[in-house]
Amino acid sequence: YAAVKVLTSSICPDDKKRYANGILSILTGEEEGIPQEYRWGAIGAWAWAGSRCVDYLETQPEFDAQKIAISGCSRAGKTALWCGAQDQRIAVVMSNVSGTGGAALERGKIGEHISDITTNYPFWFCKNYAAYAADEDAMPVDAHMLLAMAAPRPMYLASASVDVWADIQAEYTALRLASELYTLYTPGLILPERRPAANQPFHIGRIGYHIREGIHDLTFYDWTCYMDFCDSYLK
């Protein structure tokens, strides 16, 4: 394997005051007539950069462009899911402790809510996301739909056992709901109703998942699980 890092600070600064100084100063959405409330935030810009990396890798003979995976942790986990959802060239979609705005269902979620994330990081998302801060149930979509957009490609999610802010149950429930679409490609695929114990990863059909013992983080254990999953599909 080879690793390619997307340096987000060079694309769109992760800063409430400076985020529009990067690529968003050029790709404003104004020319396309996109209303202000629906225009990209930083996560959209970072995901765009991920696809531009794929563009480059396709031109380099030392890489197999049919075997590209994407991953990220926390805000980068949200980004990986969004990039993977939009770019079908990505063969394996992986995300680590992505929580609100990522793999976790908004409805019934504990820990971080839309009101929290849009107060602390309003620039990550389009402005319309904050319209559901007071009524998450009114949002017409939820995380399982984002996850399902990876199908039929292999998808791997990871949570952390004491990551209450991300809500591991909301992440796992979204994964189970998304798996219903995967049954169109893998008949009989059924994920366990109860989430697995910590450090007990599973691969079922084209879906992988684990809960790592510990806090909101990305560790060597997580990478080991990701590589084991990729071995099944990319080697």
Where are these regions (language model features)?
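Cap/lid segment of the alpha/beta-hydrolase catalytic domain
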Residues: Y1-E62, E106-R107
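Mobile cap/lid helix-loop segments that gate and shape the active-site cleft of serine hydrolases
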Residues: E30, S95-L146, E171-E193
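Active-site loop->helix "elbow" adjoining a glycine-rich segment at hydrolase catalytic centers
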Residues: A42, S74-G77
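Short glycine-enriched nucleophile-adjacent loop
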Residues: G50, E58, G77-Q88
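Alpha/beta-hydrolase fold nucleophile elbow
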Residues: E62-S74
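C-terminal catalytic histidine-bearing segment of alpha/beta-hydrolase fold enzymes
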Residues: A130, L175-K235
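Short, proline-enriched alpha-helix->beta-strand connector loops that line the catalytic pocket
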Residues: M149-M155, H203-I207
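Conserved strand-to-loop "acid loop" that flanks and positions the catalytic carboxylate
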Residues: A151-I168, R212-I215
